[in-house]
């Protein structure tokens, strides 16, 4: 069985998508599902529109500290696939998949060699 936390393993709403929640999840051996958006040219972890205090996708990979735990990445904006793939390769993270409900967006992600899942 594979267990994924949702926005990290948070104990209060304020911890969602925050470092403490990701540390807790990864330290227990759980992967996570989270959302990636962009703000001012940076990839950030945020379910809603970024406010400026989000951790970056690169910081999330640093928190993983080389643990190749499963990541389910919901890409929330266009044009991020190449940078996401670059960072995954930089951190040698292979245990991931991206997903999106938009078929055209998934086609773009597939062209970049990202692993993509969908629901029909």
Regions found by a protein language model. Name each.
Residues 1-120:
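Phosphate-group recognition and catalysis centered on beta-loop-alpha active-site segments
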């Amino acid at each position: 069985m594979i267990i994924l936390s949702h926005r990290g393993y948070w104990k209060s709403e304020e911890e969602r998508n925050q470092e403490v929640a990701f540390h807790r999840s990864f330290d227990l051996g759980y992967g996570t599902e989270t959302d990636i958006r962009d703000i001012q040219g940076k990839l950030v972890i945020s379910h809603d529109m970024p406010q400026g205090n989000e951790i970056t996708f690169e910081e999330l990979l640093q928190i993983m500290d080389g643990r190749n735990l499963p990541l389910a990445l919901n890409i929330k904006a266009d044009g991020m696939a190449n940078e996401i793939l670059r960072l995954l390769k930089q951190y040698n993270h292979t245990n991931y998949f991206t997903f999106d409900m938009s078929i055209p967006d998934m086609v773009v992600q597939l062209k970049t060699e990202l692993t993509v899942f969908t629901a029909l």
